[in-house]
Design a protein with these regions (language model features):
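A short, Lys/Arg-rich alpha-helix, primarily the initiator
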Residues: 1-19
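Residue-level signal for the short linker/turn that defines the boundary of a DNA-recognition helix
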Residues: 11, 21-22, 51-54
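Residues within the helices of the helix-turn-helix
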Residues: 14, 25, 57
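Short alpha-helical DNA-recognition segment
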Residues: 22-41
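Short, basic-rich loop-to-helix N-cap that marks the start of a DNA-contacting helix
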Residues: 45-61
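The alpha-helix within a helix-turn-helix
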Residues: 17, 28, 60
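Short, charged recognition helix plus adjacent turn
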Residues: 69-80
C-alpha cells in the first residue's frame, strides 16, 4: 500500500505538470529541486523513493494547485 501511494502521487504530479504546460526542468527550477529528483518522483520506479509532505507542498505550490489533487485516484487511462 505504501508503495502505491508514492506511485499515485508521482503520476498525479506528472499529470498536473503537463496540464500546466511545464517540463520537468521547469518544475525543478520553480521548486529548487533537481531535475533528477522531479524525474524520479514521476517515474514508475518512484514507489522505491520516498518524499515528504513538505516536498509535496512545495510542488503543489509551484504548480499552483491544491495539494489534495496529488492524491486523487488515477483514471483508467494512462496519465501520459
Amino acid at each position: 500500500m505504501e508503495k502505491d501511494i508514492y506511485y499515485l502521487v508521482g503520476q498525479n504530479i506528472k499529470k498536473q505538470r503537463k496540464l500546466k504546460g511545464l517540463t520537468q526542468l521547469q518544475l525543478a527550477n520553480k521548486t529548487f529541486f533537481s531535475y533528477e529528483f522531479i524525474r524520479k518522483i514521476e517515474s514508475k520506479s518512484a514507489c522505491r523513493n520516498t518524499f515528504s509532505l513538505a516536498t509535496l507542498s512545495k510542488i503543489a505550490s509551484a504548480l499552483d494547485i491544491d495539494i489534495r489533487l496529488l492524491f486523487e485516484p488515477l483514471d483508467d487511462d494512462k496519465t501520459a
